[in-house]
A protein has these predicted regions:
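Polytopic transmembrane helical bundles with strong interfacial aromatic enrichment
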Residues: 1-145
Length: 145
């Protein structure tokens, strides 16, 4: 059995979908739509997305060796890599808050901090998707022509 080459495109969709949806659900809950199941769903999706992020980053770093060392590619690729590690940090902080206090979404004193982390996480997810799309569709990285 051999792994597909490149592997990164096969795994990258999971953290994007899980982190974006989990963040959106947590934001909806924080902003007032209080349904008992929402925190459970949000934290589960964020945790699974964070785990999937490790696979996406690892496969991306391996596949990076196949990318051309072109200045235009590196101008998009380097921020793309940095944002991936930023996602690990932002969502790691969110999960740490959840670990410290399982009811953190109910804590009024942490609301602005959580909102900031969730919005920053969503912004990074959007940037990751956009920059990854630029690498593939605009610059042809990983595409045989």
């Amino acid at each position: 059995m051999s792994l597909p080459a490149p592997l990164h495109p096969s795994v990258v969709h999971f953290p994007i979908a899980l982190l974006a949806t989990g963040s959106a659900i947590a934001l909806v809950y924080l902003l007032g739509w209080r349904r008992p199941a929402l925190p459970v769903i949000a934290w589960a999706m964020i945790f699974l997305g964070w785990l999937a992020l490790f696979a996406a980053i690892l496969s991306g770093l391996v596949d990076r060796n196949r990318a051309p060392d072109d200045a235009a590619v590196l101008a998009v690729l380097n921020p793309h890599i940095a944002a991936g590690f930023g996602l690990l940090i932002v969502y790691g902080l969110l999960l740490y808050e959840r670990l410290r206090n399982p009811g953190v979404l109910e804590a009024r004193q942490r609301r602005w901090y959580l909102l900031a982390l969730l919005v920053a996480g969503l912004a990074l997810v959007l940037f990751e998707g956009w920059s990854g799309g630029r690498l593939v569709y605009d610059l042809g990285v990983g595409v045989q022509r």
